[in-house]
Amino acid sequence: MAAARNATPTPQNGRDASRLSFAKITDTLTVPDLLALQTESFDWLVGSDAWKRRVEEGTAQGRTDLALNSGLEEIFEEISPIEDLGETMQLGFTNPYLEEQKYSIDECKERGKTYSAPLYVEAEFMNHLTGEIKTQTVFMGDFPLMTEKGTFIINGTERVVVSQLVRSPGVYFERQQEKTSDKDIYSARVIPSRGAWLEFEIDKRDQVGVRIDRKRKQSVTVFLKALGLTSEQILEEFKGVASIELTLEKDSILTKEEALKDIYRKLRPGEQVAAEAARALLDNFYFNPKRYDLAKVGRYKINRKLGIDKQLTDSVLTVEDILATIKYLVSLHANETKMNGTRDGKPVELRLDVDDIDHFGNRRIRAVGELIQNQVRTGLSRMERVVRERMTTQDIEAITPQTLINVRPVVAAIKEFFGTSQLSQFMDQNNPLAGLTHKRRLSALGPGGLSRERAGVEVRDVHPSHYGRMCPIETPEGPNIGLIGSLASFARINSFGFIETPYRRVVDGVVTDTIDYLTASEEDEFLVAQANAPLTKDFRFAEDRVLVRPKGGEVELVAKENVHYMDVSPRQMVSVATSLIPFLEHDDANRALMGANMQRQAVPLLRSESPLVGTGMEGYAAIDAGDVLTADASGVVQEVSAEVVTIQLDEGGTQTYYLRKFDRSNQGTSYNHRVLVSAGDRIEAGEVIADGPATENGELALGKNLLVAFMPWEGHNFEDAIILSQNLVKDDTLSSIHIEEYEVDARDTKLGKEEITRDLPNVSPELLADLDERGIIRIGAEVRPGDILVGKVTPKGETELSAEERLLRAIFNEKSREVRDTSLKVPHGEQGTIIGVKVFDSQDGDDELGSGVNQRVVVFIAQKRKITEGDKLAGRHGNKGVISKILPVEDMPFLADGTPVDVILNPLGIPGRMNFGQVLETHLGWIAKQGWEVEGKPKWAERLPDHARQAPAGTKVATPVFDGALEEEIAGLLDSTTVTRDGDRLIGSSGKTRLFDGRSGEPFPEPVSVGYMYILKLHHLVDDKIHARSTGPYSMITQQPLGGKAQFGGQRFGEMEVWALEAYGAAYALQELLTIKSDDILGRVKVYEAIVKGENIQEPGIPESFKVLIKEMQSLCLNVEVLSADGQAVSLRDTDDEVFRAAEELGINISTRFESSSIDDI
């Protein structure tokens, strides 16, 4: 990936070199590697070579905040040594390393395996009594590896581990108002990475109290005495502090022992107090590294907040920390604003302030590496217990590290995390942007995080400290709003897990190219100017007063000499998806949010087309998403086919690139590579070899540039509905390929083996026509619902046969009665072409099929879906709609030169939504499509870059967010577009033109806005939603049809619908709906029979739900009976009897998915 990032600018390398940009500001920093968040974190965990190189570079630059040990080394160091209770022996671990992986990525996907490598660690067992040392290399289980794209392959499916946003360990000070008086109550909390909390608070009587492990409040002076301070030392430390002196006066305890006992009594009421137990209790809470861990980040936060200089490796609390916390708290209480402390060995004045928990200085990221590390730590601590037990039970002479260690808990912990954790998610592979955004997602949910129900508005809200760190726009709509965010484009994560954003340093009013990465807390100390603050030629601020952001987020004007930093880029504050929206600055934030989210739902089309109006981010997004194939090294293309490209490298040797052809993505879209190079082409490192799904020439291409008119048309585009031209259907402009996967297993059953065969009972030869001799469908066959894909028979229980039947069996060797047909068939609503078949056989050594499975067949069906009524389309500005009508091209409105428009949108969708960016995009799209030439030096063109003064037709343009084309530039360019061959300019500076009605040929009375808009086809396709049921499965208890397409369910006829029919007096229609169309078991089978035989439908019977109601009333001890018209009690049969009777009497079972080919299924 790194090679791809610094590639030489050629039109084919996916960078914005081939786009004509309207940007006024040149970026001082290129967009960083967008997957670094994932890959760098995992590199640290396993200690890869790339991580070692980064550490060396950082150390050379004099950075001290780098982690010098890999994540795995850290946890094995933490757990070592494991000692037995008598401390006579110990087991230590050093030097964890990974061997070569067992299967390649492609093999893992093919076979449903996990892409992993065996983890080994050197274990050393030491016997203290004899001094004997035994060393062995021990296998610690298979460790899942990350692919280059930042994903994991678990059981053959691609998954992503989402980074988690959590509260950082450290010390926090809070101010709350006392309910009864106007007094402010101050409190402090010391929160560790793991271990017990420690809380201090000053109450309304000015008493200082402490809470240990969230239990009862106690006097702080008792706590200090328990830590070994005398009353004199406490007075010495807090000289002149009234609240502490007051607390000390009321405290009658004198010695450390008494204080410890007093604390023990309050923590463990009702237990016998021993001095030793009391001492151990406090030690274990805060001073034992096994039980309490601040982590480096917690120590760093405490050092900074309280002005202490402690080593970052000091991971437990010290008396000094506790005293400093109490001093800070009492100073806050006394309304002081400053306090003395030390930082880096120098005395500093600390600004006293309460903490804002939603500030990004107090929230940190747990990235992949740390999440997996925590999981391995859990597994190792479980293993530690096993090791201790084995040390006591095994013969001390025979013990080796191998006999002590059981790796099962470690393997189970890792497996559990990847398989079931809320943060390990099935990767969104709809298009390259969806995958990239998924990997850059930040979630506040998950273990150790927040829950949806408990999260208030404050946590979800946009905070000034998010600037340049988390995107204020891109977040889901719905219950997770604000809890799930996306990393900003230029942000990175430091070794403590805080998000840093880059700024250009300003020295004496001169903006330099020196770039500093600042965390949110560091940024609070500076004044930052925005990226588009005007500069002179020598990089000084052009104006005397500059708009800056001080702490707190309110902007203000300050003298230019006082500015410390300046933003590196106008798109610094937004995420990748948001920075792909042109004219974002003209859109309302709510609509921009929808636009950013809907780009992720765009389906890759048959032919990808990059936008005429982009933002310059398209290349970065496509290449970093990893779906585009780029050259690792420069050379000459030697050989090209649809599946393989071979390159003769400049440094000698060849390199072969394998392309993926029509693979199924996680979302069922087609994943296909298309070669861009030819044999003999010269290719540089980082240049694009092949396009992936939804990319064109290495640029993101999610939709199509279509000619759009904003006008009402016969009411068909009322309420966001969209009218399309038949041309788009005919030319496959918005067609996409979707691939579904179906699998069937042949297992061992109690009655014998299932068999995959062509020899199926009672199946006509026509249905078997496309099956090969094995009973598996041939590639290329067209299939429809109900067609057999894989023939399979299952043995059936033998029934006792009469003598005559046995004779017939003997004569005709009739075997068909022993098996039933359980073939894999095409489900309802699915159809397409067979594009692939995979067969796995346990006899071929495919041991991974699972127990009892002899054979597995996987069939892939591809279908081309043309655009149709009911499909959902959207622009990039949150302007979405459903297609209501596809008009013949001759009925579409057309321009003066006869060009029919492709899409008609409702103009009323714009003013209320305030996403005006779509109109500007439409105008600029027209300009780009036509080409332009600016004559002379008009005033509006003064700020245009020189290269943007003329362009040929079809030029792709970039208008970066917050730094794009201006309104007057667009109006001017509309007047400068290339004229048609008749010398006409169809659209002038108003952006409107005269349209003609395709049906009558008459012009419409008013001019209409027309231009090119980039339109996406979203994954909400009508083919996936449309659904019909005749008969199908029923619920076990109520015997009513199930609901939903997945269950092949029916339509719910609810309470309000019943009222509607009652209001109309439609009694018979209502009776049918409530009985034979729902849960009258016998009645519905009789109706089915009557329809088949063409007879009249009989009277309905008693619905099952009525019987359920009676049973419920009987369970409440109410004696309920049903009486017939003549007063006789009616006996109600059990459900099972009813179902059985219906099947027995009528020989029909209507609850199967497909009408069975054999009557024996009943």
Curated annotation (Swiss-Prot):
Gene3D superfamilies in alphabetical order: 2.40.50.100, 2.40.50.150, 3.90.1100.10, DNA-directed RNA polymerase, beta subunit, external 1 domain, DNA-directed RNA polymerase, subunit 2, domain 6, RNA polymerase alpha subunit dimerisation domain, RNA polymerase Rpb2, domain 2
Family of this protein: Belongs to the RNA polymerase beta chain family.
Record keywords: DNA-directed RNA polymerase, Nucleotidyltransferase, Transcription, Transferase
Function: DNA-dependent RNA polymerase catalyzes the transcription of DNA into RNA using the four ribonucleoside triphosphates as substrates.
Name recorded for this polypeptide: DNA-directed RNA polymerase subunit beta
Classification via HAMAP family: RNApol_bact_RpoB (MF_01321)
Origin species: Clavibacter michiganensis subsp. michiganensis (strain NCPPB 382)
GO biological process assignments: DNA-templated transcription
NCBIfam families: PRK00405.1, rpoB
PROSITE patterns named in the record: RNA_POL_BETA
Entry EC no(s): 2.7.7.6
GO molecular function: DNA binding; DNA-directed RNA polymerase activity; ribonucleoside binding
Enzyme class: transferase
Record's subunit section: The RNAP catalytic core consists of 2 alpha, 1 beta, 1 beta' and 1 omega subunit. When a sigma factor is associated with the core the holoenzyme is formed, which can initiate transcription.
GO cellular component: DNA-directed RNA polymerase complex
Keyword check for Nucleotidyltransferase: yes
Reactions listed under catalytic activity: RNA(n) + a ribonucleoside 5'-triphosphate = RNA(n+1) + diphosphate
